């Protein structure tokens, strides 16, 4: 059945919103997916994420094929051409269909006079593809990262930077966290097998399962009933390290969208959890996740730098601080990060992290535990941040810290520090 929309033009609009307006893909896509079929939702996501993942390559190709870049009101067609090139390079969409749908995207974008240009560029690429791809392998853009970020990663990991870049450029695996209140991991693996969904357990994380192929969450047994949550295995380590106990007072700071909040309560259902986040809109996601899993926490809006505004004289047994960060460890999940972040952001984020750490420390009980976590791979936000904190706090002792790096079949890039109050 013929659809009333052109998916390639929708993808071009999404990419324009990211690159020209600085919006995140995760904020843009849900609205654009509202009136399209489930099958096309998945393809739209593939086109948007894939185009942004390979952006430098697509830009380079266009530079080779066009004398002048499209600018101003025609800029949207530059992104449409990118979508077309991505399809030809990386998807199973038949070339003739990719070509036709991309060219028709010009009509949907009210630029029918440029159909011929788009058709010409894409056909020229088809003719020159092998030669262009061979040349690209010697180009500086081949790492698909902005130069400032590439430099930072090289400096931080002189022996490992290439494997990190490779990990960042992969499509991410889909990890699940089994809700131990309902099922053991082995029981849930059996449920997946019954549904024909191939999956693997993880020796290092007791409730983690990796799917062989990502799927729609509504195909997962008992998803709506709260039997399982989508959460990367590295993120699952946060609540595991925190080791919450029933009846304890626990603060989950920077809690949205609630994956760690709910994990804490799955481990310790009778814990008293206060979930705080500065973003009221994202707090709605925390409440949704709590409701789906039938768990209870107190959810409040608040700035981690000013705890006196939202927790009065409370004292906590354990605090989980998933600090605001560059998110350089989750680029494979959010490739737009590469183009939304700027070099100067890192120092600003490190300052915010420092302020939150110092502000929240007095609210941790003596003998209590704080887990500091980020989804960053940059030392300024991680090991260096913790070293500076420990040197300024005589009653703080770090018993464990670890940096995970993004790997193809493993977890996201993540940092953890387990700090005890003497």
From Swiss-Prot:
Reactions performed catalytically: cytidine(967) in 16S rRNA + S-adenosyl-L-methionine = 5-methylcytidine(967) in 16S rRNA + S-adenosyl-L-homocysteine + H(+)
Localization per record: Cytoplasm
Its EC number(s): 2.1.1.176
Alphabetic keyword roster: Cytoplasm, Methyltransferase, RNA-binding, rRNA processing, S-adenosyl-L-methionine, Transferase
Main location: cytoplasm
Annotated Gene Ontology cellular component terms: cytosol
GO MF terms held by the record: RNA binding; rRNA (cytosine-C5-)-methyltransferase activity
Record keyword S-adenosyl-L-methionine present: yes
GO biological process: regulation of DNA-templated transcription; rRNA base methylation
Positions that bind S-adenosyl-L-methionine: 254-260, 277, 303, 322
Active site: 375
UniProt enzyme class: transferase
Top-level division of the source organism's lineage: Bacteria
Entry function: Specifically methylates the cytosine at position 967 (m5C967) of 16S rRNA.
NCBIfam families: PRK10901.1, PRK14902.1, rsmB
Family recorded in the similarity comment: Belongs to the class I-like SAM-binding methyltransferase superfamily. RsmB/NOP family.
Protein name (record): Ribosomal RNA small subunit methyltransferase B
Organism: Proteus mirabilis (strain HI4320)
Gene it is expressed from: rsmB
């Amino acid at each position: 059945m013929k659809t009333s929309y052109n998916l390639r033009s929708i993808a071009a609009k999404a990419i324009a919103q990211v690159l020209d307006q600085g919006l995140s893909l995760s904020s843009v896509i849900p609205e654009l997916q509202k009136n399209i079929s489930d099958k096309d939702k998945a393809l739209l996501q593939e086109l948007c994420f894939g185009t942004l993942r390979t952006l430098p390559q697509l830009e380079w190709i266009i530079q080779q094929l066009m004398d002048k870049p499209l600018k101003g009101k025609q800029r949207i067609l530059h992104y449409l051409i990118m979508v077309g090139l991505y399809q030809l390079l990386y998807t199973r969409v038949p070339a003739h269909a990719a070509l036709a749908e991309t060219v028709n995207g010009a009509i949907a974008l009210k630029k029918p006079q440029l159909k011929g240009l788009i058709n010409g560029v894409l056909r020229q690429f088809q003719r020159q593809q092998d030669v262009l791809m061979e040349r690209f392998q010697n180009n500086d853009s081949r790492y698909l990262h902005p130069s400032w970020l590439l430099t930072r990663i090289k400096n931080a990991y002189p022996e490992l930077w290439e494997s990190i870049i490779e990990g960042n450029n992969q499509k991410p695996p889909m990890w699940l966290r089994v809700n131990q209140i309902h099922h053991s991991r082995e029981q849930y693996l059996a449920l997946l097998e019954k549904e024909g969904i191939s999956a693997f357990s993880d020796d290092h994380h007791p409730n983690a399962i990796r799917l062989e192929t990502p799927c729609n969450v509504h195909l997962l047994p008992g998803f709506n009933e709260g039997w399982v949550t989508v959460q990367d295995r590295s993120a699952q380590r946060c609540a595991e390290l925190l080791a919450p106990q029933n009846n304890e007072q626990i603060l989950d700071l920077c809690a949205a969208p609630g994956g760690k909040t709910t994990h804490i309560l799955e481990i310790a259902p009778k814990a008293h959890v206060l979930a705080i986040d500065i973003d009221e809109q994202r707090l709605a996601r925390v409440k949704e996740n709590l409701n789906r899993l039938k768990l209870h926490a107190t959810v409040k809006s608040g700035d981690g730098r000013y705890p006196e505004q939202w927790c009065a004289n409370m004292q906590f047994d354990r605090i989980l601080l998933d600090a605001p960060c560059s998110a350089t460890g989750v680029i494979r999940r959010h490739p737009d990060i590469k183009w939304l972040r700027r070099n100067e952001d890192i120092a600003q984020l490190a300052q915010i992290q420092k302020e939150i750490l110092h502000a929240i420390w007095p609210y941790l009980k003596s003998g209590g535990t704080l887990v500091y976590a980020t989804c960053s791979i940059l030392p300024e936000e991680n090991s260096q941040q913790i070293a500076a904190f420990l040197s300024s706090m005589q009653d703080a002792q770090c018993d464990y810290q670890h940096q995970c790096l993004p790997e193809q079949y493993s977890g996201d890039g993540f940092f953890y520090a387990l700090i005890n109050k003497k």
